[in-house]
Amino acid sequence: MHQPTTTEDLVASDCGLRERKKQQTRSAIHRSALALVTDHGLAGVTVEQICADAGVSPRTFFNYFPSKAEAALGLPATTVPETARAAFLGSTGALVADLCDLVAHTVTLPQDRRRMKELVRARPEMVPAMMQWMAHARQTVLAVAAERVDEDAARTATTLVMAAVIESAHRSADGSRDELAARLRAVVGEMGRLATA
């Protein structure tokens, strides 16, 4: 096993460990919320029960998820990374193709989509939380798109690419963000062909 030997190695090792711990905590909260909401419904579960089951405090819970519905669905926060924003705004390429890249680097699809779909089917009260998450993701992307083109073009292009996100989530397994961008471009292309068929 590699032992850290330099200050840089120690910092990188610490950051890696810290990031793994965050992912483990997030995953524990999600698993607990998913199990409890599946068994008892959204109204039948409290944040405190989720926290007790996951072994975290309510303060920790709210550092990871804004609500018990989002925790049960495993919906991550949607923020545009500065590097993706700068690449999109600085590009002179095709708007929709560039938006596919921006969305792929901004919107993180839930890891366990199969269980998420099962939860939504079993507990329809979860649908509004999912729709709200999608609307927030769309608004986040739209705000950046509107910095590059007029608002009408930004809205139409963003709506098209977000529809491709939904379709892509139904079709494919996980992959890298670059693979997601390629899938989004393929789905958008298919939508265009269907629209003119």
Feature names for model-found ranges:
Residues 78-82, 111-139:
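Short secondary-structure transition hinges
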Residues 16, 41-42, 56, 62-72:
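HTH DNA-binding helix-turn interface
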Residues 1-40, 44-53:
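Basic, helix-initiating cap at the start of DNA-binding domains
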Residues 1-9, 174-197:
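C-terminal peripheral helix-coil segments that are non-catalytic and often amphipathic
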Residues 147-189:
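Hydrophobic/aromatic-rich alpha-helical bundle segments in the mid-to-C-terminal region
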Residues 38, 46-47, 76-84:
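Short, basic, alpha-helical segments at the C-terminal edge of helix-turn-helix-like DNA-binding modules
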Residues 82-116:
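Hydrophobic alpha-helical connector segments
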Residues 124-159, 167:
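Amphipathic alpha-helical packing segments from all-alpha helical-bundle domains
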